[in-house]
């Protein structure tokens, strides 16, 4: 029979295991929080925010419950909060490993419907996740009712292998969803990350179950008790860090900006997807004359005018309408036969502008919003047509008239005039007769310099 620290906890290896698990959790916490702080990622109410948060919570539950249930720490007195069924059954099971795997299965479920079925999942994540967790809850309730645990929180063989089978069942479910999306040509390595997650979780479960079985069955061997619980906690710590690090969520943030192999960051989904002429306005962007009498939808095709109008709208706290127009405009540049990129862009627009609580939620009619959210084809060319019509009406009613009299339009016209003047000067200096004239010999040199400095000065 095991005795001493092997029985009551507090062996040197136990404290080493606790220290390793604490380090693992802080690494996990830093990997989940720091990227959001560095890149100033906006908080949303969508699953892309809550699922990673739940993963962090379930990881903490898993590590802390293992530490409490296998007697790693020595406590002089028996406290009510050391109740075996609280830690070894409920928190380690449904609220630990079960919740961690359920989050991953939910992500795979979303990928399946979005990229294979080409529509949003029929069940919301906040409903699907508890449904996936139900087998763990039922299993924990049965164990709690039958009370097979002894005073050391150990259960016999008749319970050990069914519990191990429940762990394996969730890995098999993840494999099933991953096989269903294996033919999709993902842009941000989601499929590879899913397979990595399966490999890591399966390997961890094999090691974990082996240590768990040895810990449960051979209670009389002291060194085996100490070694098996050390492996249990350390493997759990490694599992949660690696599992969280392999993220198939929010590709624009976690798959692009945070990859060390990337030499630069993409600020927009259009840039990440390789949409031509996407992103910030370049200073050498060609000026095209703007006629205020032209239709607004035609004027907005002028990139410089659109960005000037967008700055004005942002100053009026109504910039979401112009940002939506630009994102939809870029979405329209993707070829119709490129369904994967169209789905990425459509999903990005939905999460940014359409869903309730979005970063730049638009003031759309309920009918239009539901048409988009319940579409049966995320690749449809007219997916955002009605929403765009409503947005254009809002722009015309609330922004256009004020823009023509704003400082932003005056600045735009000044830049346009300067560009035209510089363009004409460029033609005159390109003649062979004046090509060899130096600045100091040119009687109009000072005048050219003053015009150039005034036109090129940032304003």
From Swiss-Prot:
SUPFAM superfamilies the record matches: Regulator of G-protein signaling, RGS (SSF48097)
Knockout or disruption consequences: Increased cell elongation and longer hypocotyls when grown in the dark. Longer primary roots when grown in light due to increased cell production in root meristem. Loss of stratification requirement for seed germination. Decreased sensitivity to glucose and abscisic acid (ABA) in seed germination process. No effect on ABA inhibition of stomatal opening.
Tissue: Expressed in hypocotyls, cotyledons, guard cells and root and shoot apical meristems.
Molecular function (Gene Ontology), one example: G protein-coupled receptor activity
Biased composition annotated in UniProt, kind: Polar residues: 429-439
Effect of mutating residue 320 to K: Loss of GTPase-accelerating activity, loss of interaction with GPA1 and loss of endocytosis
List of residues that carry Phosphoserine: 428
Outcome, altering residue 428 to A: Loss of endocytosis
BP terms from Gene Ontology: jasmonic acid mediated signaling pathway; negative regulation of signal transduction; positive regulation of GTPase activity; regulation of cell population proliferation; response to abscisic acid; response to glucose; response to water deprivation; sugar mediated signaling pathway
UniProt superkingdom: Eukaryota
Induction remark: Up-regulated by ozone.
Transmembrane segments: 9-29, 48-68, 83-103, 126-146, 157-177, 194-214, 226-246
Alphabetical keyword list: Cell membrane, Endosome, Membrane, Phosphoprotein, Signal transduction inhibitor, Transmembrane, Transmembrane helix
Localisation: Cell membrane; Endosome membrane
Protein's membrane topology: Multi-pass membrane protein
Region described as Disordered: spans on this chain: 429-459
Keyword Membrane: yes
GO cellular component labels: endosome membrane; nucleus; plasma membrane
Domain remarks in the Swiss-Prot or TrEMBL record: The C-terminal domain (249-459) is able to bind to and to accelerate the GTPase activity of GPA1.
Assembly behavior: Interacts (via C-ter) with GPA1. Interacts with WNK1, WNK8, WNK10, SYP23. The association with WNK8 at the plasma membrane is triggered by induction of glucose and continues with trafficking into endocytic compartments. Interacts with NDL1, NDL2 and NDL3. Interacts with RHIP1.
Its biological purpose: Glucose-regulated GTPase-accelerating protein (GAP) for the GTP-bound self-activating heterotrimeric G alpha protein GPA1. Cooperates with G beta-gamma dimers to maintain an unactivated but fully functional pool of GPA1. Phosphorylation-dependent endocytosis of RGS1 physically uncouples the two proteins, resulting in signal activation. Free AGB1 is essential, but not sufficient, for RGS1 endocytosis. Modulates cell proliferation, abscisic acid (ABA) and drought stress signal transduction by acting in a hexokinase-independent glucose-signaling pathway.
Protein name: Regulator of G-protein signaling 1
Species annotation: Arabidopsis thaliana
């Amino acid at each position: 029979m095991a005795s001493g620290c092997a029985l009551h906890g507090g062996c040197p290896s136990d404290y080493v295991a606790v220290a390793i698990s604490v380090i693992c959790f802080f690494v996990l916490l830093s990997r989940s929080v720091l990227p959001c702080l560095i890149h100033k990622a906006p908080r949303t109410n969508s699953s892309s925010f809550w699922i990673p948060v739940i993963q962090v919570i379930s990881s903490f539950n898993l590590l802390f419950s293992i530490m409490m249930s296998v007697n790693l720490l020595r406590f002089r007195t028996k406290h009510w909060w050391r109740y075996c069924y609280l830690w070894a059954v409920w928190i380690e099971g449904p609220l630990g490993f079960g919740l961690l795997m359920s989050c991953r299965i939910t992500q795979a479920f979303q990928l399946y419907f979005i990229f294979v079925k080409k529509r949003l999942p029929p069940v919301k994540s906040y409903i699907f996740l508890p449904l996936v967790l139900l087998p763990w809850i039922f299993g924990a309730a049965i164990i709690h009712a039958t009370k097979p645990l002894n005073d050391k929180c150990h259960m016999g063989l008749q319970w050990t292998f069914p519990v191990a089978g429940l762990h394996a069942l969730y890995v098999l479910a993840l494999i099933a969803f991953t096989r269903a999306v294996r033919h999709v040509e993902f842009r941000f390595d989601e499929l590879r990350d899913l397979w990595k997650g399966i490999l890591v979780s399966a390997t961890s479960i094999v090691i974990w179950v082996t240590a768990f079985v040895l810990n449960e069955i051979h209670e009389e061997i002291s060194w085996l008790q100490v070694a098996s619980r050390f492996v249990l906690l350390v493997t759990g710590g490694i599992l949660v860090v690696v599992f969280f690090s392999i993220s198939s969520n929010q590709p624009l943030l976690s798959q692009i900006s945070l990859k060390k192999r990337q030499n630069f960051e993409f600020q927009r989904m259009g840039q990440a997807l390789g949409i031509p002429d996407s992103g910030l306005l370049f200073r050498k962007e060609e000026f095209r004359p703007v006629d205020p009498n032209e239709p607004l939808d035609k004027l907005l095709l002028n990139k410089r005018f659109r960005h000037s109008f967008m700055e004005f709208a942002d100053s009026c706290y109504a910039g979401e309408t112009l940002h939506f127009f630009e994102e939809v405009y870029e979405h329209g540049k993707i070829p119709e036969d490129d369904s994967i990129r169209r789905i990425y862009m459509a999903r990005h627009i939905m999460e940014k502008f359409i869903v309730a609580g979005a970063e730049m939620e638009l003031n759309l009619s309920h009918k239009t919003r539901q048409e988009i959210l319940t579409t049966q084809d995320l690749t449809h060319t007219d997916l955002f047509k009605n929403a765009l019509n409503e947005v254009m009406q809002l722009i015309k009613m609330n922004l256009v008239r004020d823009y023509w009299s704003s400082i932003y339009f005056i600045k735009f016209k000044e830049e346009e005039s300067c560009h035209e003047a510089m363009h004409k000067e460029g033609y005159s200096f390109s003649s062979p007769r004046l090509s060899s004239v130096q600045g100091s010999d040119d009687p109009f040199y000072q005048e050219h310099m003053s015009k150039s400095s005034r036109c090129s000065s940032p304003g």
